[in-house]
Amino acid sequence: MSERRIHYSQLKNDNLNQISPSSAPSPITLNHQLTDSSSSSSSGGNNRISPIILFIIVLLSVIFFICSILHLLVRYYLKKKRSNLSSSPNESNQNPEFSDSDTYQRQLQQLFHLHDSGLDQALIDALPVFLYKEIKGTKEPFDCAVCLCEFSEDDKLRLLPNCSHAFHIDCIDTWLLSNSTCPLCRGTLFSLGHQFEYPDFNFGFFAGDDGGGGVRVSPVQKPAENEIGKRVFSVRLGKFRSSNIVNNGEVVVGGGGETSSSSLDNRRCFSMGSYQYIVAESDLVVALCPNNEGLKNNKDVEGKKINMRSKGESFSVSKIWQWSNKRSKFPNNHPSETNLVVGGSSSSSSYVCSGSDGLSLNGRRFQGP
């Protein structure tokens, strides 16, 4: 028994010697180990990517790819379109006759299909021009229907061949810059199915129905003409006279101290308040040289001058009547009391005028500045 006790005590001492204070873990060391283990576990959880974030990244990548494809397609389409446009002038140069015809047609359609768009200055300059003293026929004083002034021998007139009305060149040029019809009868410069040739141009214009209710104007070849010969145009001029309209339809006309009673034809009577513009019945003609030789822009022409205005403006009739002119046929009336209305049916050319400071034509009002 004593030996066993001694052996047990020796073993116990040996075990105590093996366990030293330095080898035993301290509380601080244990706390550090616990902290490291918790941090490693949390970092491992954060390294995992959420499925929602992954889906958003993939979706944005797909959208970016599709946008890039569309951008490339658009650039390719625009580049191809530019190449086609650049090649079209070369094709038109190969067919000059076809291209010129299309160009004239587009320009004329733009001029005549727009509502009161006016005419181009080149087209206005192509209308016949002559001096008042060159008119052959019964010579009597006539007045310009635009500026209301009497023509003098050296006045330069421009003729509208379709209706044969003539006006001072400055008056009608200003009017045609903002209107495409005659200021007196409101007739168009081109008739349907009528071939009209300008003296200044080497080609004429043919006006016809385009099938859609509009007017189609296309260039036509001008026939050969003798350079020495002159072309004869009919001219329709008139004069202003004061008038009093009676209930029975008779018109008492007075002008220059004369008074007469007659039933005036509506086709040549243009009423302007207490005055009427009466177109003469005499056959007036004028012979014009080709290309209006000798009548190119001459600034020394006598007569009433109207300043050229910007395109889109028109006359104010009441303000034009305020001009002082010793040759005028009118007494000194108040312009504000003078009415001017122009209207008419298709069967007759009767025109009546109203408006104190503007011009009303066929139900449309043209206000002056």
Swiss-Prot record:
GO terms for cellular component: membrane. PROSITE patterns: ZF_RING_2. Disulfide bonds: none annotated. The chain crosses the membrane at residues 52-72. It is an enzyme of class 2 (transferase). Residues 332-355 are annotated as: Disordered. It is a single-pass membrane protein. One of its GO terms (molecular function) is zinc ion binding. This is RING-H2 finger protein ATL47. It comes from Arabidopsis thaliana (Mouse-ear cress). The lineage of its organism: Eukaryota, Viridiplantae, Streptophyta, Embryophyta, Tracheophyta.
